[in-house]
């Protein structure tokens, strides 16, 4: 028995046959002009979490790169955005992680974000110069830890690969020192956008006592439909 699900590709287009926990809070978007569709897609609450953090990280690191404002103001802005992102993550993902029995992943990410926030604020307000000079390294490292935990918890190869991407990006920042905040923002926000737009691999679905028998049966049928769709698409 393999640790990862070999029948699942690392990434692929989203499948329409969603489980109960994915249908909860599903957001569908369709933008069109007349009969011409500009964009059509759907986002589960997990996808919405990725989008939220993508906006937060882009806002933080692009502001640091392009706007000549004081470190104190930036610390306040970063703290506010990070707290909003952490709270939004908890609200959006709580039901999903409980059904999938991976609540510890949510707690892990919350701890990592708060740790990063405290260290960042201390580097600015307490004058921790060593930390201040390596804020990009810090956040890439913390994110890598979070992705590794997520990859192990969900048995997902893509999260482990993204974790490695963040980790190996740290030494590369020395080559783009004048643009390290922009580079960090692109890496972090880009990976989050990728995860929100595509379907990623994870372990096979599990039953949970939180769901009724009807919901469990619905999930089994959806799983069979996804497998059939994947087989026909080959």
Identify the residue ranges that each predicted region occupies:
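Membrane-embedded alpha-helical transmembrane segments of multi-pass integral membrane proteins
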Residues: 56-60, 85-88, 143-146, 169, ...
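Hydrophobic alpha-helical transmembrane segments and adjacent interfacial helices
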Residues: 58-65, 115-126, 146-148, 166-178
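Membrane-proximal helix-loop-helix units in multi-pass membrane proteins
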Residues: 102-163
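Physicochemical signature of membrane-embedded alpha-helices that form the seven-helix bundle of GPCRs
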Residues: 52, 135-142, 184-187
């Amino acid at each position: 028995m393999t640790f990862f699900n070999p029948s699942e590709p690392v990434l692929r287009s989203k499948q329409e046959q969603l489980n109960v926990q994915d249908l909860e809070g599903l957001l569908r978007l369709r933008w069109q002009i007349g009969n011409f569709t500009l964009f059509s897609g759907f986002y589960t609450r997990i996808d919405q979490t990725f989008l939220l953090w993508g906006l937060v990280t882009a806002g933080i690191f692009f502001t640091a790169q392009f706007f000549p404002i004081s470190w104190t103001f930036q610390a306040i802005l970063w703290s506010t955005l990070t707290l909003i992102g952490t709270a939004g993550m908890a609200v959006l993902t709580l039901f999903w992680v409980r059904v999938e029995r991976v609540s510890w992943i949510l707690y892990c990410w919350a701890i990592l974000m708060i740790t990063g926030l405290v260290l960042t604020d201390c580097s600015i307000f307490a004058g921790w110069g060593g930390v201040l000079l390596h804020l990009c390294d810090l956040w890439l490292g913390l994110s890598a830890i979070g992705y590794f935990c997520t990859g192990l918890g969900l048995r997902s190869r893509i999260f482990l690969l993204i974790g490695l991407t963040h980790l190996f990006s740290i030494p590369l920042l020395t080559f783009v020192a004048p643009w390290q905040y922009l580079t960090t923002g692109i890496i972090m926000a880009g990976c989050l956008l990728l995860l929100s737009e595509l379907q990623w691999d994870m372990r096979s679905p599990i039953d949970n006592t939180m769901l009724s028998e009807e919901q469990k049966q619905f999930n089994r049928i959806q799983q069979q439909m996804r497998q059939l769709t994947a087989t026909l698409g080959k």
